[in-house]
Amino acid sequence: MALRGSHRLEVIFKRCIASPVFHSHAANRRSSQLAIKGTDPSSNGNSGQDQQNGEQKAKGWRRLVRFFVPFSLGAAVSAAVIKREDFTPTIAASKMTGRRRDFNFIADVVAGCADSVVYIEIKDTRHFDYFSGQPITASNGSGFIIEQNGLILTNAHVVINKPHTMVQVRLSDGRTFPATIEDVDQTSDLATLRIQVNNLSVMRLGKSSTLRSGEWVVALGSPLALSNTVTAGVISSTQRASQELGLRNRDINYLQTDAAITFGNSGGPLVNLDGEAIGVNSMKVTAGISFAIPIDYVKVFLERAAEKRKKGSAYKTGYPVKRYMGITMLTLTPDILFELKSRSQNMPSHLTHGVLVWKVIVGSPAHSGGLQPGDIVTHINKKEIKNSSDVYDALADNSKNLDIVILRGVKQMHVTITPEDP
């Protein structure tokens, strides 16, 4: 390949030499050099020595081309990367031809609904960044606009994390606004926010009842705080009961998808190929297993919230009486354990129960104590943990510290956490 590339470069260089422009400049340079030396450029008194010198120069040019041009190309590529904002693609889909036009259906979906997706940050008003002096980001998530006057839908666990926080929303165009919480249903894990701005792009709501397993879907959001991220997959199941996931007090049949969803995607939309939201991204168990709240269930929540607004009953910030640890967790049911063991060789074969930690709030007691996403809690204060209810019961206990036994991969570890009082 290297020889073939060098040969092509030589051909290109020879063509350049053959061009009139090259010869005109070359002739001018030769005339100038000969004039300086006091030699007549039209003289034909050159000998065989001159011909030999010309051949040596030609060989030198070839070596120079082989060495210099690849580095020139590399420099050009580097310059293109550095100045990539100057070359943002602006080709409309209607101007594309061939397969790009016929098969890029995911791009068509994104073009129609991405502007309505927002990035949500939860700021801790008690802790400030050393350099900027601004409140630090305690956690983040996603949401999407459902009314032009600034009403935003998201997950309750995104905005209800702990006391002494404020909510900020960043739109797809980069504008940032403070947000107020309008309504929260912690049982269904849904919430609405309001920002004071009008004429916003709105996400259309579809019907989750018409979904079929195997349908293409697109997940939009801000995983790991990376705004405007797009992933795609299919609906794995339309009827994944909350009891199968070990979620207490929830009577929801979740949508299961293999679209990549991770931390920060929570609250973002799961969209069908018509550009309609058919679910709200809620949780991830492992790669290829994620869940979303069906949009039909969300519509019931929105109707109730609208009735409350008509009656003038505003949402009052209320935090759980239980102590705060700072994790989002999922009960390991037999079905989920089977999926995890089939996908990962690091899962202990003897594991039959526990709670999976899939998110840890930065700066929380769990974070300070060393708990990490992916840890599996099996015991707290020597009591066996079989589901998330057992963890809540442990938090309700008056013990100052929680001695937690976890599985991290195949290793069993102990971490000590001191929950915050409400």
From Swiss-Prot:
Keyword Metal-binding in record: no
Ranges that cross the membrane: 64-82
GO molecular function annotation: serine-type endopeptidase activity
Keyword Transit peptide: yes
Catalytic activity: Cleavage of non-polar aliphatic amino-acids at the P1 position, with a preference for Val, Ile and Met. At the P2 and P3 positions, Arg is selected most strongly with a secondary preference for other hydrophilic residues
Motif, IAP-binding: chain positions: 75-78, 94-97
Family annotation (InterPro entries): PDZ, PDZ_6, PDZ_sf, Peptidase_S1_PA, Peptidase_S1C
Enzyme class, first EC level, given as a word: hydrolase
Record localization: Mitochondrion intermembrane space; Mitochondrion membrane
Subunit structure: Interacts with th/DIAP1 (via BIR 2 domain).
Protein name from the UniProt record: Serine protease HTRA2, mitochondrial
Organism of origin: Drosophila yakuba (Fruit fly)
Lineage, top ranks: Eukaryota, Metazoa, Ecdysozoa, Arthropoda, Hexapoda
Name of encoding gene: HtrA2
